[in-house]
Amino acid sequence: MATVTARLPRARMNLWRLEWLRLRRTPRALTLAAVFVFFGLLQPLLTKYQSQIFRHVGNGVRISFPAATPAQGVGGYIGELSGTGLIVVVVVAAGAFTFDSRHGLATFLRTRVTGLWQLVAPRFTVNAAAAALAYVLGALAAWYETALLIGAPDAGGMLAGMLCAAVYLAYAVAVTAFAAGIARGTLATVGIALAILFLLPIAGVYRPVSRWLPSTLANAPVDLLRGTHHLSYYLPAFAVTVVAIAAALAVAVLRLRAREI
């Protein structure tokens, strides 16, 4: 009995290490970092030279833009938090949570844990941390490029924005786990997760609830840079997002536990 008990913590620890190695030794981590860093370097460049770009694209038609501000330089990158960057995060996370799509892998993993939470927790934590790190790397690239081409953005706003983005990306990973509890395949999981993430902001048109929506955190970095709001303004969204993350993971575990392999 003591031998079996001693093996359980080791098995749990190995699952954490397994998820870390799976992310690091495959193109997933590199893809995440590359996408965010690419847009972090590109968007300030596009913002700085948008007049020249439109002149070439528009067959010589001159279009004048006001002088770019540091907030605009970084703002283009922040937009990827609700666009390409978000899609890549969901696709990578879906690959981790849809282990039931492969019968052999599902059997192997499920027979080595005493509860489904031991499978979900490492996948959520590692993928959320990887997404946050990738975003921060891209934000640092955008920060450097903007300071070089346009002017230095507000440091406090940048750091507060990184915090908001990290929490929102953790929410996106939790929503993906929830979707994996509904659908078995990777493609269906990605579709459900993106539908939730893209449709939820529509509720923000009703002003009384807009401050409480997790999607508010996706736009927060821009407002923090512009000085429109302070970090305390987003405390309701932080609270709701944390509760939503816990609820999504709990439902994911319950759904996965009830699923037949």
Positions of predicted regions on the chain:
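Short helix-to-coil transition segments within interhelical loops
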Residues: 108-115
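Junction motif at the cytosolic side of a transmembrane helix
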Residues: 2, 243-261
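Transmembrane helix-loop junction
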Residues: 22, 99, 112, 143-147, ...
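Short hydrophobic, aromatic-rich alpha-helical segments embedded in or entering the lipid bilayer
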Residues: 208-229
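Hydrophobic transmembrane alpha-helices of multi-pass small-molecule transporters
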Residues: 44, 113, 131, 201-202, ...
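Short, membrane-interfacial amphipathic segments enriched in basic
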Residues: 1-16
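Short helix-terminus and kink motifs of transmembrane alpha helices
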Residues: 95, 99-103, 177, 254
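Secretory targeting signals
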Residues: 2-6, 28-29, 33-96, 120-187, ...
